[in-house]
Each structure stands twice: as C-alpha cells, then as structure tokens.
Amino acid sequence: MSNKHTQADVILIGAGIMSATLGSLLKELSPNLEIRVFEKLENPGEESSNEWNNAGTGHSALCELNYTSERTDGSIDINKAVKVNEQFQLSRQFWSYLVNRNLIRNPEDFIRALPHISLVQGEDNVTFLRKRFKALVNHPLFNGMEFSDDNEKLKEWMPLIMDKRDTNEPIAATKIDSGTDVNFGALTRLLFQEFDHKGIDVNYNHSVEDIKRNSEGLWEVKVHDMNDEKIEYHTAKFVFIGAGGGSLPLLQKTGIKESKHIGGFPVSGLFMVCNNPEVIEQHHAKVYGKAKVGAPPMSVPHLDTRFIDGKKSLLFGPFAGFSPKFLKTGSLFDLMHSVKSDNLFTMLSAGMKELPLTKYLIQQVVLSNEKRMEELREFIPNAQSKDWDIVIAGQRVQVIKDTEDGGKGTLQFGTEVVCGEDGTMAALLGASPGASTAVHVMLEVIQKCFPEHLQEWEPKIKEMIPSYGIALSENPELYKEIEVSIEKALGLKNEEPMVIPS
C-alpha cells in the first residue's frame, strides 16, 4: 500500500464534459486554484461524453417535441422549451469565449451548424405541431422556424425521408437552421488538452474507491492507481463528482444527508448507423419524431446527421436496452450495490409505479434487427437492412427520488445537481439534456458551492458569458448581438448541400 498523500483546493472525479467544464470555469475565475482530476479510464470523454455514446444534439428545444406539452385547454406550454434553449445559449457563449482566446481551437472539430426538424404523421400530430409552431415562431429564441405540410417542400427539407413515402397520411414538419450537432467527446478532449497548460493535475487509470471526511473537515478521497496497483489518499476542500453513471455510488459513499433516499435506474441505448456513403449524403439534418403514446421521453426517435472524426455519419435511434451496469465499463452488480437501507422503499415504489417503463424496456430488449429496421422505415421508407449496423451507446442512470408532486419513488428524466449543505461536495446525476447544459449546470454548482466568491467572480463570469443573470428571451436585442458573435466565433454557417435521391 502506498503512503502517498496530497492536498488540493478542488478534486474533480471523472474526466467527462462536466468536469472539463467546471475545471475550465474555475481556472478562468481563479487561476491559482490547485485542481486534481481522477479518471478511471485511460483517456478523457470515454463514457457518456464520448461521441458514440450520445446523440450529439445541441439540446435547445428547436426540434425536441417533449419540451413542449399540450395543456388541457389545447394550448401549448413552451416554458420548458425556452428554459432548455436559454441553458444551451450559456454553453455556446462559453465555447465562443474559449475559441476567441485561443484556449481551444478549430471549433469545427466539435460543433457544426445543422438544421433541426420536427416530423410528425397523423392528423392529431399535425394539429399539435402546427399549434407548437404558432406558439414558438414569434419567440426571439426560435426566430426563423418554418412550418410546412406541403410534400414538395418537405422533399426539399428531407429528401431521404420523403423518397418513396406513402403520402396518403397527413404529414408535417417544422425546420429551423440555427440547430447544431455537437461532438461532446471531441470538446471534452480539447478542454482536457488545455488543462495541461493550466496546470491542472489530471490522473488517468485512477479509480476512486471511497470518499469521506477527515478529522480536519476536509474530504479524503481514496484512489486506486491502476498503473502501479497502489492506493493513494488525496484531500481537498471541495469535491465534484462528475462520473456519469458512476456518480450515484460515489455520492452514496460520502454519507451526506443529501445522498439519502436517491436511487438510480440504468437504461442502455443503441443506435443504428448507416454504412452506405450514398445514403448518408442524402440527409443533412437532425429530424426528431414524436414518442409513441405511453413511451418514456427517452424513446423519442430521431434521424441524425453527425460529424465524427471530421466525417459525416448518419444515425437512427435510440433503441433502449437494459443492463444493471451504471457505466459501459461498469459492473453487473452496480444496480444491486446501489440499493441501500435509506433508498430501498424509494426504489421499490418506483418499481411499482414504472411498470409501463419496465414493459417498454422488455419490448425493446427483445427487438430483432429486422424489427428495428421496421422502426427505421417509418423514417426512411426505402431503408435497406444491409446499409445499417448497430452501435451500442452509453449507459444513462435515471434518477429516482421522493418528490412532493410525484410522491415516493418518482423517476426523474433530466439532469440534477446534488450539493451538500456546506457547499464542499457536489455531484451531477441524471441524463438528458445533460452535456448541452454543462455550462448552466456548472454555474449552478459554483453558485451553490462558492457563494463567498460570487461577487468577486461575477465580472469575469459576465465576460465569459455575456447573458449571465439575464433572460435572453426578454432581451431580444442582446440575443441578436450575442448570436452574431457566436456564429462568427464557432463558424456556424449552414451551407451543406444534400444529394437528392434519383
């Protein structure tokens, strides 16, 4: 056993997009902070942040229909859509700041302009989409959105989807050109490259085994150095757990009261990836459909143009699966070990409540490849099985907790920050919109955990993120000004041609 002991101001657990974002923000705000990162794998961004483990959508509610619900009176509630969009704007502003200061280069390596399209079929769904369009089109954050139920126009927008489609059923779409495809794996790697220049101590192949308070009130992190097979102890005033699906088990080890009565339910994902370049060139958009009645939000089908390793790709999904692992590289015992005396009834209550989700997952797990192709053909009628392969995406651990509205054992479909009451410990749990909101979420961590520095740091935060503390939806002129600077910094011009099927 090693007797290595070190002390730092901040320890970040996990080398994904969340730790990358928090580390970058903190070093800009306080360059003298001593920060250490511990990552179990050999490289940054290999789990949930990896480009093959998520859909790469810059979630801004431009096309994701689950962010706009229909009220009982038939009107459309856009509050969640506006909130998600505002949060993504913070990320884009911070990335622009980093690019403008040459802290990261070549933004096309991690972000591309890409139209976002919502597609629905059936009279009721077309009516819903038309109402959604009318509710959003005059909002400054959704400026430029178009609606069409004209087949010829839809062929211009989505030639691959409309080719050989039966047009007897009503069909409609909205399109907005200000959407993006984001390679969060590439972005994470770029941010960690910059960590080397900022003096942040990054340790790969280091697995965190335990977290507890020592007699001095600091957090002591027990780390297994898998390179030398040694145990190390590192202390810090503040610890952030950004370990994806591995965050919940580590949070439980801290023993803080905020870690109690929280459970996690792992859901795995699969995508179909096109292997035919001719087909790939016929599509240039992220096209989101509508989840089937009774299906969970995670099941929304979408056909996505992706840019991975500088190469254009085409993916369809997601299809859900089940594994008790909390990470792709996790253990089959992760789920079982996460059940504690304080969350047992929370987990059991969720099991009783979420029978439809259980049924959905069982149905998804037993799907054959040809059944998946049938779902794909609802998007691409002429899809050929030989042109598509299966890729296994990342694990997502959905948060289960007791809430006032939902009662005991309520499943949460979202991203959640858990902070200790003294502000020395924070963890990031949950799933979508996840990485898209990284800057918003990490600012929340800073506000909750470093309140004594906020007044001092606020001018720098506003330099990095001009709309910090301001609702862009209520300041359209500021939004226009910021949008112009973002497009210039990140090179967000949508000029990609499509090949029309012959």
Curated annotation (Swiss-Prot):
Q: Does the keyword Oxidoreductase apply?
A: yes
Task: List the GO biological process terms.
Answer: tricarboxylic acid cycle
Q: What EC number(s) are associated with this protein in UniProt?
A: 1.1.5.4
What Pfam families does the annotation carry? Mqo
Disulfide links within the chain: none
What chemistry does it catalyse, as a reaction equation?
Answer: (S)-malate + a quinone = a quinol + oxaloacetate
Q: Name the cofactor(s).
A: FAD
Q: Highest taxon of the source? A: Bacteria
GO terms, molecular function: 2-hydroxyglutarate dehydrogenase activity; L-malate dehydrogenase (quinone) activity
Q: Which keywords does the record carry?
A: FAD, Flavoprotein, Oxidoreductase, Tricarboxylic acid cycle
Q: What class of enzyme is it?
A: oxidoreductase
Give the pathway annotation.
Carbohydrate metabolism; tricarboxylic acid cycle; oxaloacetate from (S)-malate (quinone route): step 1/1
Q: Does the keyword Oxidoreductase apply?
A: yes
The cross-references to PANTHER family, in alphabetical order and at most eight, read: L-2-HYDROXYGLUTARATE DEHYDROGENASE, MITOCHONDRIAL
Q: Sorted alphabetically, which NCBIfam families does this protein's record hold? A: mal_quin_oxido, PRK05257.1-1, PRK05257.1-3, PRK05257.1-4, PRK05257.2-1, PRK05257.2-4, PRK05257.3-2, PRK13339.1
Give the family from UniProt.
Answer: Belongs to the MQO family.
Could you identify this protein by its name? Probable malate:quinone oxidoreductase
Which species is listed as the source? Oceanobacillus iheyensis (strain DSM 14371 / CIP 107618 / JCM 11309 / KCTC 3954 / HTE831)
Gene that encodes the chain: mqo
